[in-house]
Amino acid sequence: MLRFETAGESHGECLVATMNGLPAGIPISLETVNRELWRRQQGYGRGGRMKIETDKAEIVAGVRHSRTIGAPLAIIIRNKDWQNWTEILPVEDAGSGADRKPVTRPRPGHADLAGAIKYNFHDARYILERASARETTARVAVGAIAKALLAEFGIQVLSHVIAVGSVRLERAASWDELVALSLRDQVLLGCVDAETEARMKEVVDEAYRTGDTVGGVFEVVARGLPIGLGSHVTWDSRLDGRLAQAIVSMQAVKGVEVGFAAEGAASFGSKVQDTIHYDREAHHFTRGANRAGGIEGGMTNGQDILVRGMLKPISTLRRPLESVDLLTREPSPAAYERSDVCVVPAAGVIGEAMVAIVLAQAFLEKFGGDSLTETRRNFDSYLEQVKNY
């Protein structure tokens, strides 16, 4: 089973990720991993932290001569901002006189209050340091490794932004547009339509002017998947459920949609289901549409997977909302921590990583293999079975 974990705080020395269960022989390019980290840092509306950090992955275990060796893989990403926090967040006790930059005025919408109560802290600093979306840097690095595995079998995962605030892309994006978007050297708001993107920018500008933040919707598309990843047999093996959990695990994501779920909920069944056809010349089944988003009964059906994440606006506001001081219990404006105005494009990149990780897990559950050669042999055998069905 492919597993991963992350560790590290927002202003700690580094972020760490480990992966276990990768077959030996997967080609790994640090340049590609770092490109994914760069993409996560881009986007109109990002805050000052992105001007400090230049995220680079260091693979310290599990890869030799640019290929996985079947051992646990470990990645470190160092925080440049750590140099400004060494005396504030030391590992060893710095004494009672140390400046800890305490956070005693929890921010509505963040983990501050619930976390402080749960872990019995009267300083929410220790909660927000781990709850911060800075943690997703490590997830994106893990996702880049998962993408490398999937790419060996012709599977690609891309994303784009379909809404910022009330401005929404009103047409479908082509695969070629998504590829071109992923190759951009300058990321604005991650929308494939220039006119729509310009209107999205106006929304972000308005939020900035008023000391506010803005959310939106991103879509992740996965192409090239075989029929049959996931299962209908148990509740927790259903692939759409696993993808939904992965997307909602992202900071600020409050909703998820697989396929055209919201549209389908307002329609009749005869207008929603994807009709089944058979191409006798090509000897395979085809579908009349893809409203299901590539998953039926918890299993891939061979079409593109479509998953959307809905982000609430970032919780940290330059014009703070009402809160209460944890120490005095008196009303007080919420604390302010350096933050972003809009993170929807970055969330799309993180969403790609989460989808790629879940798909890589499902792929290895289906095809197994201690080496890439063995995995490929199992995969090819299954494709032959599907072809001869």
Swiss-Prot record:
PROSITE patterns assigned to the protein according to its UniProt record, in alphabetical order: CHORISMATE_SYNTHASE_2, CHORISMATE_SYNTHASE_3
Needed co-factor(s): FMNH2
Pathway: Metabolic intermediate biosynthesis; chorismate biosynthesis; chorismate from D-erythrose 4-phosphate and phosphoenolpyruvate: step 7/7
Binding-site positions, FMN: R130, A131, S132, Q251, A252, G297, K312, P313, I314, S315, T316, R338
SS bonds (residue pairs): none
UniProt binding sites for NADP(+): R40, R46
InterPro entries in the record: Chorismate_synth, Chorismate_synth_AroC_sf, Chorismate_synthase_CS
EC number: 4.2.3.5
A GO CC term assigned to this protein in UniProt: cytosol
Keyword set, alphabetical order: Amino-acid biosynthesis, Aromatic amino acid biosynthesis, FAD, Flavoprotein, FMN, Lyase, NADP
Gene Ontology biological-process entries: amino acid biosynthetic process; aromatic amino acid family biosynthetic process; chorismate biosynthetic process
Gene Ontology molecular function terms on file: chorismate synthase activity; FMN binding
Record note on cofactor: Reduced FMN (FMNH(2)).
Swiss-Prot/TrEMBL catalytic activity: 5-O-(1-carboxyvinyl)-3-phosphoshikimate = chorismate + phosphate
Pfam families for this protein: Chorismate_synt
EC top class named in words: lyase
NCBIfam families: aroC (TIGR00033), PRK05382.1 (NF003793)
Assembly behavior: Homotetramer.
Function: This reaction introduces a second double bond into the aromatic ring system.
Protein name as annotated: Chorismate synthase
